[in-house]
C-alpha cells in the first residue's frame, strides 16, 4: 500500500506518477479526511488527559469525605465524548485505508507513461521468422489438433471455460509436472494450498479491495463476503507467514505451488481472443 506520509508531503507528485500508469486520482479529499482524522486524535488526546486529571482527584476527595458524584458524571461524559471521537476517527481511517489500498504501486521512474502502445523495445534477440504460409494462432492450432474443445467447455460451464482433450490434456499435465520437477531441483519447497481462502488472504496479498469483483465468492461472515476461490496460488503463498516473525536464519523461504486459478475475467480482450490464460479457470505453477 502507498505510504500515506509521502501522499501528505508530495500529493501532486504521487498523482503524476499514478497517472503514468493510467490511474487518475486527486488526493484533495483524502488529505482533508486525513487532516480531520488527526484533528480528532488531537482532540481525543486532550480529553483523555483531562479525564486522567479528574480521575486523579478521586482518591483525595474520598479521603477528605467530599462528594464525588459530579466528578464521576463529568468523567463519564468525557468518556462518551472520547468514544464518539474515536469512532469517527476509526470510520475516517477505514475510508482512507480502503481508498489508498485500491491504488497501484508507483512505477519506477524509468517506466514510460501510458499503456502498451507506448512500450519501448530495449532489446531483440534472433530474427523474426518469415513464413511462406498463413501461420495459425494457438487457438487455431489447439482446435485443429483436437487439443482443446472450446464449444463443449462453454456448454459445461459457460464462456471462459474449455476442455483439454486427449494429447492436449496430457500436454497440460506434462507441463505442470515439468515445472514442479524443475523447481524441486532448484531447491524450492512444493506446497499444496487450500483453494478456498478468507478475505484477509486477498487483502494482505495486495489484491483487495481493487480486485474484489474479479474473484468468485463462496461465503459470508457477519453479513460481509468472506471466502473466495483462490485466483492464484500466490494469494495463499504470500500469506503463509502472515502475522509471524521469522528469524534471519530461517530465510530465505522459497515456495511454489500448483493450483487451478479461478477468476471472473472481464475486459475487451475476452471478446478479441480465446486464450488459455485469461479464462475463468486455468492451471498455474506459482513461485514466491
For each of these PLM feature ranges, what is it?
Residues 124-288:
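TRNA-recognition modules of translation machinery and tRNA-sensing kinases, especially anticodon-binding
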Residues 1-129, 147:
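N-terminal alpha-helical targeting/anchoring segments
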Amino acid at each position: 500500500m502507498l505510504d500515506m506520509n509521502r501522499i501528505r508531503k508530495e500529493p501532486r507528485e504521487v498523482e503524476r506518477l499514478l497517472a503514468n500508469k493510467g490511474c487518475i486520482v486527486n488526493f484533495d479529499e483524502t488529505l482533508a479526511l486525513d487532516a480531520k482524522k488527526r484533528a480528532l486524535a488531537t482532540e481525543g488526546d486532550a480529553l483523555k488527559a483531562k479525564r486522567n486529571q479528574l480521575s486523579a482527584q478521586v482518591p483525595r476527595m474520598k479521603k477528605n469525605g467530599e462528594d464525588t458524584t459530579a466528578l464521576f458524571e463529568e468523567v463519564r461524559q468525557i468518556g462518551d465524548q472520547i468514544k464518539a471521537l474515536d469512532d469517527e476517527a476509526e470510520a475516517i481511517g477505514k475510508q482512507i485505508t480502503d481508498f489508498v489500498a485500491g491504488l497501484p504501486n508507483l512505477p519506477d521512474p524509468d517506466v514510460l507513461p501510458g499503456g502498451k502502445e507506448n512500450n519501448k523495445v530495449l532489446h531483440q534477440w534472433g530474427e523474426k521468422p518469415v513464413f511462406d504460409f498463413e501461420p495459425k494462432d494457438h487457438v487455431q492450432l489447439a482446435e485443429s489438433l483436437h487439443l482443446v474443445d472450446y464449444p463443449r467447455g462453454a456448454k459445461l460451464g459457460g464462456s471462459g471455460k474449455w476442455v483439454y482433450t486427449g494429447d492436449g490434456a496430457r500436454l497440460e499435465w506434462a507441463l505442470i509436472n515439468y515445472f514442479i520437477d524443475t523447481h524441486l531441483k532448484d531447491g524450492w519447497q512444493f506446497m499444496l494450498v487450500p483453494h478456498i481462502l478468507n478475505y484477509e488472504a486477498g487483502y494482505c496479498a495486495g489484491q483487495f479491495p481493487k480486485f474484489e469483483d474479479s474473484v468468485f465468492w463462496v461465503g459470508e461472515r457477519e453479513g460481509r463476503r468472506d471466502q473466495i476461490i483462490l485466483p492464484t496460488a500466490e494469494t495463499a503463498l504470500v500469506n503463509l507467514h502472515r502475522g509471524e516473525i521469522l528469524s534471519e536464519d530461517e530465510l530465505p523461504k522459497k515456495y511454489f505451488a500448483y493450483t487451478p486459478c479461478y477468476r471472473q475475467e472481464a475486459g475487451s480482450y475476452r471478446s478479441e481472443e480465446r486464450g488459455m490464460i485469461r479464462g475463468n479457470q486455468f492451471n498455474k505453477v506459482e513461485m514466491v
